Design a protein with these regions (language model features):
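Active-site-proximal substrate-binding groove within the catalytic cores of carbohydrate-active enzymes
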Residues: 1-109, 122-140
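Short beta-strand segments within Ig-like beta-sandwich modules, predominantly Fibronectin type-III
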Residues: 113-116
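Non-catalytic C-terminal accessory domains or segments of carbohydrate-active enzymes
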Residues: 121-173
């Protein structure tokens, strides 16, 4: 039986690579947290994926998916293939992204924040065979940003439209 961290890693790898999605579990008896994982994978994304460390490691640990829907953003995955918890660091430049400031949201935990090449995202004690799954959006001054949700692993295709319009001004006399 796979641990929750291992199920999340397997789901992340399949989702990020657009792999075949086969749900062979008995869905009516599946625990709610695992059913939620399956739900977050649909619809399947069929976009080109970049495996960043394809030739650098026995088990690639960094995957990048570029999304262009209602806006442009990146989905990054970082894996811990070790048999014990490890700290993971996600630096946008190491994922071959432009240096700059970004907002992020981690899918499995809901953690949100900001990062840059000088201030990468740090995750403490990622479980053995676990992963982090991040939506990364460039920070634009004076502009509202959608950070993501837990509806779909991409943290963005669930949006039909994102409007960044100033609030109407009201004059009080």
């Amino acid at each position: 039986r796979l641990s929750l961290a291992e199920v999340r890693s397997l789901a992340t790898a399949i989702a990020m690579t657009g792999g075949a999605l086969l749900l062979s579990d008995d869905l009516p008896v599946l625990p709610a947290e695992r059913l939620r994982i399956a739900e977050a994978l649909i619809p399947v994304i069929n976009e080109p994926v970049r495996i960043i460390d394809w030739f650098d490691a026995e088990m690639p640990a960094r995957i990048r998916l570029d999304m262009v829907e209602t806006e442009s953003w990146h989905v990054l995955a970082g894996f811990n293939w070790a048999d014990q918890p490890v700290d993971l660091q996600i630096d946008p430049v190491e994922y071959h992204l432009e240096a700059g400031h970004y907002f992020y949201r981690e899918f499995w935990s809901g953690q949100i924040g900001e990062c840059s090449e000088k201030d990468p995202i740090r995750f403490r004690a990622v479980p053995a065979h676990g992963c982090v799954l991040i939506a990364l959006r460039r920070k634009v001054a004076e502009k509202a940003a959608y950070l993501g949700s837990d509806l779909h692993f991409s943290q963005g295709i669930e949006l039909a439209e994102w409007l960044d319009e100033p609030a109407p001004s009201h004059q009080v006399e």
